[in-house]
């Protein structure tokens, strides 16, 4: 059986903690590993992640130090295999491209952002070119249906498998009916973070054109840190279009329960990112019967359509009647069978890890 080492190669606390807790709390019980799953993790706050006793974890304080350790391990033991969860570490892509990490050692669960090329800055355009070259050398790619479609268009000869991120979900939260708001005013959730990929200002203009200034807008911008300049730009644009009392720009990180309460108050989600992201928030909205608008360039719509989840596309006509009908359709869905919901994605992980460990061809 192949020695398998899981790699979280960038310091993304929320996502990394979700993966680690999923392995520690769920997969260890579901699969019954012969040995503790091995993880190599970048983090500046070990205490946040170091509560998974069922895992064998090695921590690194930088992307560079982790990459050096991965490369050293790959070169010293060509029979070991790495399962990269997401991949925002330039050094690891370059190691794959140069052959320091071999194709059969590099299995990858793509998280969306690392497939797409948003920035126009010269240094990023150069990196995108090198990353495209490296991605054709991956041994096996796991991703959502839409991202597999995108990847296979560029690299048709690389083996792929469907796999969903282990979104933190509680099936008991799924509601059967929605309570109408007393004042009848629509509440719209704009974006899933303060990242520029949400295209907040463009979305604000589109929302104003569709609904005027008589809707409530909630914009969560607590993540990423040190983002005040962009937050100010979004706030200025929002105030030029909507009344202050109809705006709620959240500038701090929220506790998970507070975030759930916020989502329950919404009537519509608006996500303009031109790539797959925000699946966690989308899953929660589906649980709460809240429809949403996506960019057609966010290929997760393929997964949604496959699971019969109603989707609005940015640029299409939209009014309160269409939204109410989408809410009705969403509430009538059997949400217990949606493939990317917990616990349904567990079987995909069982199969993926069996393949990666050489137990399944």
Swiss-Prot record:
Which superkingdom is the protein from?
Bacteria
Q: Which reaction does it catalyse?
A: beta-D-ManNAcA-(1->4)-alpha-D-GlcNAc-di-trans,octa-cis-undecaprenyl diphosphate + dTDP-4-acetamido-4,6-dideoxy-alpha-D-galactose = alpha-D-FucNAc4-(1->4)-beta-D-ManNAcA-(1->4)-D-GlcNAc-undecaprenyl diphosphate + dTDP + H(+)
This entry's Enzyme Commission designation comes to 2.4.1.325
Principal location class: membrane
| GO cellular component labels | plasma membrane
Claim: Secreted is one of the keywords in the record:
no
Instruction: Name one molecular function that GO assigns to this entry.
Output: 4-acetamido-4,6-dideoxy-D-galactose transferase activity
Q: Which UniProt keywords apply?
A: Cell inner membrane, Cell membrane, Glycosyltransferase, Membrane, Transferase
Pathway of action: Bacterial outer membrane biogenesis; enterobacterial common antigen biosynthesis
Location comes to: Cell inner membrane
Record's InterPro entries? WecF
Question: What GO terms describe the biological role, i.e. biological process, of this protein?
Answer: enterobacterial common antigen biosynthetic process; fucosylation
- Topology in the lipid bilayer: Peripheral membrane protein
Instruction: Please name the top-level EC class of this enzyme.
Output: transferase
Q: Which family does it belong to?
A: Belongs to the glycosyltransferase 56 family.
Q: Any idea what job this protein has? A: Catalyzes the synthesis of Und-PP-GlcNAc-ManNAcA-Fuc4NAc (Lipid III), the third lipid-linked intermediate involved in ECA synthesis.
Name the chain's protein. Answer: TDP-N-acetylfucosamine:lipid II N-acetylfucosaminyltransferase
